[in-house]
Amino acid sequence: MSKARVIAFYLPQFHPFKENDAWWGKGFTEWTNVGKAKPLFRGHYQPRVPADLGYYDLRLPIIREQQAEMARNAGIEGFMYWHYWFGNGKTLMANIFNEVLESGSPDFPFCLGWANHSWSRRTWNSSSQNHKDVDLMIQEYPGDADIISHFNNVLPAFKDKRYIRVDDKPIFMIYDPMGLPNPRHFIDIWNRLAKENGIDKGIHFVGLASGWLEKYSRILEIGFDAIAPSNLWVAESKVKGRLIKMVGHKLRKIGRASCR
C-alpha cells in the first residue's frame, strides 16, 4: 500500500499589502489580531507568540526557505498555495507565489488551490457594533473568456518542475466546487486547454468538501477526480458510526429515564 502524500495548505497572507491597508489600516496583517489576543480565563495562554520564525513576513525569501526546510523535516511533501482569482483578472496576494515561481526558490514541491469565495468585512470585524456585513471583494464567474484567462494565468505554474502531480496530471484544488456555475464545463475547458499546451493527461481536479458523504458523491459526479475533506472528524464519526449510534442510544435512554 502506498503512503498518503502529505501536502500543507499555505496561506500567503502574512505580510502587508495595499488592499488590507485600505480595509483595516496601514500595516495590518493576520499577526495584528494574533498579537492582540487576551487571556479569557486562568491559565489561558494568550497571546500565543509564534515559535521558530516569530511574527514572520512572507515578503522575505529567507522566511519562505526556512518554512520549506521545516516542512521537509516534518515529512511534508509540498505546499498547496491558496490562489485568489475573483474574475475579470482580479487577484489578491499573488506576489508571494509569483516570486516563488519566478525565482525557483524555495526548491520545494507545490500546487495551487483556488479560494473561490468572496471577502467581506466580517472576516476581521464581527463585533456587535457592526452587524451589517460589507463585501470587500466579490467572487465572480464572468464566463468562458474568464475561464480561459484564469487558465493562462496558472499555466506557468503547471509547467514548473516543482509542481505536484498525480498520474502525471498537475493537481488543482477548488475551495467551493459547487459554487462554480457549471463545474463540468469549467473542468472540460481547462482539460482541453491543458492538452493544447502540452499537459497531455489534463488536470487532476480536487474538490474541497465537508465530511458528508452525499456531498462527496455530488462532487465526483460533476467531474472532479478527488475530494479533500475539510472536516475529518465527520469522516471519523462515520467510521466509528456503530459506536456513536450505541452512545446515542444510551444517552436517549438516560434522558427518558430522567424525565419520569
Regions found by a protein language model. Give the residues of each.
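Glycan-processing catalytic domains of CAZymes
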Residues: M1-R260
